Amino acid sequence: MNDAVNPTAAKTVTGWPVSEAAAGAILTIDLGAIRENYRRLKALLGGVHCAGVVKANGYGLGAAKVAAALTREGCDIFFVALLAEGIALRKAVGTGPDIYVLNGLPPGSEPEAVAAGLCAVINSGAQLKAWRAAVHDAGRRLPAAIQVDSGMSRLGMAPAEVEALAGDSSAFDGIDIKYVMSHLACADEPRHPANEQQRLAFERLRAMLPRAPASLANSSGIFLGPSYHHDLARPGAALYGINPTPGEPNPMLPVVWLQAKVAQTRRIEKGAGIGYGHSYHADGPLSLATISFGYADGWLRRSASAAWFEGVRLPFLGRVSMDSIILDISALPPGRLREGDLVELLGPSQSVDDAAGHAGTIGYEILASLGPRFHRHYVGG
């Protein structure tokens, strides 16, 4: 099967062509909502530049499609996590936007980054030395961001490294420092003392480095106020509809609608065991539906415990299987739900954040875990 033969086919991240008819589930992605979320964030930032974080294949939604939509809103800076993501994104968006590799470049991969026109994020003295060698080999200045560890203890130059560089006037020769940046650990908790501690540490560390624009705010950091905005904000989760202000109404539009197909319906009697391990036994006659969707599609076994059909909640019964989930559809009129019908897993009845709450995780994990077997349907954009 190929797209020329089947115009409804949609390539997944694995390259599989999955038509709507062939897929077990449909993932609808609203690019128009992503664009509106970007506009809302830009409005909060005033004149501050706003990038787009499209790592992990655009949080599982398709980095190339998301970046193209954001480009139409004027976004010209993107962040990915890995060099491979950056190379793929460069092929998708062309030569225009700047693309930064957040995790830094693996040793020896610098020529690939230079060839793809990527901007290194320098997280250590060793990476700085390697990027300077790349400058020498390229025979020209190369762009980079310098990331400092302001208190998250994850990525970035340690304070001692920054202090050592402060007295070395030649340390950054040949490097076009686009930004000095850091990352907030607790921005989704506005009253957490670490936010202000990190902001002050960031100001102290960047003052030791060559003068350059600064970037600190992630999605939630934007909502901490102008003192966190600096010259560039780097929203990711908020673009995709995840609430950047937990505990408050979500200021972002929802972006995804996930529906799974009913593979089979049946009636069972009291006492019948359901699913692997017979972890549930019917306490009376039940109507069941099995959907073609499971943990191989990224739905964690601990994730939200119900689907929805026409506003009616359909609880999961038994364990989530690799390719299927069993629903209790007894609340529906007999025959109302049939094979091939679609039930909602994410959408108006159950947001990404709702599903994450049921699973004891965060919306980022729900989206980034979504697998490649869906038919992906893009609207808007």
Curated annotation (Swiss-Prot):
Enzyme Commission code: 5.1.1.1
Name of the coding gene: dadB
Keywords: Isomerase, Pyridoxal phosphate
N6-(pyridoxal phosphate)lysine: residues carrying this PTM: 55
PANTHER family: ALANINE RACEMASE, ALANINE RACEMASE, CATABOLIC-RELATED
One Pfam family in the UniProt entry: Ala_racemase_C
Organism: Mesorhizobium japonicum (strain LMG 29417 / CECT 9101 / MAFF 303099) (Mesorhizobium loti (strain MAFF 303099))
Protein's UniProt keywords contain Isomerase: yes
Described function: Isomerizes L-alanine to D-alanine which is then oxidized to pyruvate by DadA.
Keyword Isomerase: yes
UniProt protein name: Alanine racemase, catabolic
GO-annotated biological processes: D-alanine biosynthetic process
Cofactor: pyridoxal 5'-phosphate
Residues at the catalytic site: 55, 276
SMART domains: Ala_racemase_C
Binding, substrate: 154, 322
GO cellular component: cytosol
EC supergroup of this enzyme: isomerase
A GO MF label: pyridoxal phosphate binding
Lineage of origin: Bacteria, Pseudomonadati, Pseudomonadota, Alphaproteobacteria, Hyphomicrobiales
Family: Belongs to the alanine racemase family.
Reactions catalysed: L-alanine = D-alanine
